[in-house]
């Protein structure tokens, strides 16, 4: 049998010598990859431009979204700031109203005191102005603004306790410039360290007081137990400065602060007191063990401790300390701790 006849018809032409155009290079192979051979194939280009455009569009969309989010956040911040400003304005209005009410109540108490009537105590939460005609009241009935609250002990009842003066601070002007180094070197019981404090610290034993002497001629005297002792001590300090050769005078003597203390002899519920008198008192036991009560009239600051000890400060005259204690004693008795 002929070799060409044994091949299939479609392969007879390829196997014949006439069909072989170039020896050694196959014309067709089923394993040959696409695009190889004699016939050149067109190169297929990918759409790289369209991919870049899509990426740019996505980036633009992301940027727009971020800008929108930032605008929303800015709007929210502006709204919060507006709300805070409104709240601050409301608080200022409330404080102004409360201050006006306090002044009104103090003036009423002063007029009652001059007329011979016992002063009335008011609840701390009722110290507001009365509502104007045509407006709704701030507090529902039966609690109306300026409603007097009767304490557990009448205000007219005397406590029988007299606060004792513990310290008096006074000032005086010596009327001349002073050389503090000379005073510190030549005077007894005097110390001067300008790096720590710009004044000479001088002490005397009778009365046992301490003076702060400044180069401007001003002097502060502390530690006296009475007004007379404070004046006497200030004169002694001025005399010491005179003996050192300075033309010291004794001008404008004035008592700046008086501190008194007493004991009511019973424990006090400070938590209940601060809740009832929130406007006048503050109590932070983690910072300070005493309750700080700021009285309006007289303008005295009281330190009230749970043991019953009371410290009064800020008075200019002795009578203010006595008056402040007589005002606070009925309130303290109303918050007496029962064991």
Swiss-Prot record:
Q: Summarize the subunit comment.
A: Binds DNA as monomer. Component of the TFIID basal transcription factor complex, composed of TATA-box-binding protein TBP, and a number of TBP-associated factors (TAFs), including TAF1, TAF2, TAF3, TAF4, TAF5, TAF6, TAF7, TAF8, TAF9, TAF10, TAF11, TAF12 and TAF13. Part of a TFIID-containing RNA polymerase II pre-initiation complex that is composed of TBP and at least GTF2A1, GTF2A2, GTF2E1, GTF2E2, GTF2F1, GTF2H2, GTF2H3, GTF2H4, GTF2H5, GTF2B, TCEA1, ERCC2, ERCC3, TAF1, TAF2, TAF3, TAF4, TAF5, TAF6, TAF7, TAF8, TAF9, TAF10, TAF11, TAF12 and TAF13. (Microbial infection) Interacts with HIV-1 Tat.
Reported function: The TFIID basal transcription factor complex plays a major role in the initiation of RNA polymerase II (Pol II)-dependent transcription. TFIID recognizes and binds promoters with or without a TATA box via its subunit TBP, a TATA-box-binding protein, and promotes assembly of the pre-initiation complex (PIC). The TFIID complex consists of TBP and TBP-associated factors (TAFs), including TAF1, TAF2, TAF3, TAF4, TAF5, TAF6, TAF7, TAF8, TAF9, TAF10, TAF11, TAF12 and TAF13. The TFIID complex structure can be divided into 3 modules TFIID-A, TFIID-B, and TFIID-C.
- UniProt keywords, alphabetically: Disease variant, DNA-binding, Host-virus interaction, Neurodegeneration, Nucleus, Repeat, Spinocerebellar ataxia, Transcription, Transcription regulation
**Where would I find the sequence repeats?**
165-241, 255-332
| Native species | Homo sapiens (Human)
Name assigned to this protein? TATA-box-binding protein
The protein's matches in Pfam families, at most eight in alphabetical order, are given as: TBP (PF00352)
Where composition is biased (Polar residues), the residues are: 38-50
Can you list the GO cellular component terms from the UniProt entry?
chromatin; cytosol; euchromatin; female germ cell nucleus; female pronucleus; male germ cell nucleus; male pronucleus; nucleoplasm
GO biological process terms, alphabetically, are: DNA-templated transcription initiation; mRNA transcription by RNA polymerase II; positive regulation of transcription initiation by RNA polymerase II; RNA polymerase II preinitiation complex assembly; spermatogenesis; transcription by RNA polymerase II; transcription by RNA polymerase III; transcription initiation at RNA polymerase II promoter
Q: Which family does it belong to?
A: Belongs to the TBP family.
Where, per UniProt, does this protein localize?
A: Nucleus
Q: Which gene encodes it?
A: TBP
Cite the record's Low complexity compositional bias ranges.
57-71, 127-138, 146-156
């Amino acid at each position: 049998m002929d070799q060409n006849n044994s091949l299939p018809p479609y392969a007879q032409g390829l196997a014949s010598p006439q069909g072989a155009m170039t020896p050694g290079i196959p014309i067709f192979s089923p394993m040959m990859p696409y695009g190889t051979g004699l016939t050149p194939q067109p190169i297929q280009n990918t759409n790289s431009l369209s991919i870049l455009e899509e990426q740019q569009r996505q980036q633009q969309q992301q940027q727009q979204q971020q800008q929108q989010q930032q605008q929303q956040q800015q709007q929210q911040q502006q709204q919060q700031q507006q709300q805070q400003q409104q709240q601050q304005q409301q608080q200022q209005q409330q404080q102004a109203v409360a201050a006006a009410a306090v002044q009104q109540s103090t003036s009423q108490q002063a007029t009652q005191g001059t007329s011979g009537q016992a002063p009335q105590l008011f609840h701390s939460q009722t110290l507001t102005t009365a509502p104007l005609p045509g407006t709704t009241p701030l507090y529902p009935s039966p609690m109306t603004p300026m409603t007097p609250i009767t304490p557990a002990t009448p205000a007219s009842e005397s406590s029988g306790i007299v606060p004792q003066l513990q310290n008096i601070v006074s000032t005086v002007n010596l009327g001349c410039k002073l050389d503090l180094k000379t005073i510190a070197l030549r005077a007894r019981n005097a110390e001067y360290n300008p790096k720590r404090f710009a004044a000479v610290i001088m002490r005397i034993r009778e009365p046992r007081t301490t003076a702060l002497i400044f180069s401007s001629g001003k002097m502060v005297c502390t530690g006296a137990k009475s007004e007379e002792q404070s004046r006497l001590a200030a004169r002694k300090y001025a005399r010491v400065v005179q003996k050192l050769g300075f033309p010291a005078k004794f001008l404008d003597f004035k008592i700046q602060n008086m501190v008194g203390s007493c004991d009511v002899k019973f424990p006090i519920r400070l938590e209940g007191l601060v809740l009832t008198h929130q406007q006048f008192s503050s109590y932070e036991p983690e910072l300070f063990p005493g309750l700080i009560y700021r009285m309006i009239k007289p303008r005295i600051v009281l330190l009230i401790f749970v043991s019953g000890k009371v410290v009064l400060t800020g008075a200019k005259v002795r009578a203010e300390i006595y008056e402040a204690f007589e005002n606070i004693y009925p309130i303290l008795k109303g918050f007496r701790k029962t064991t």
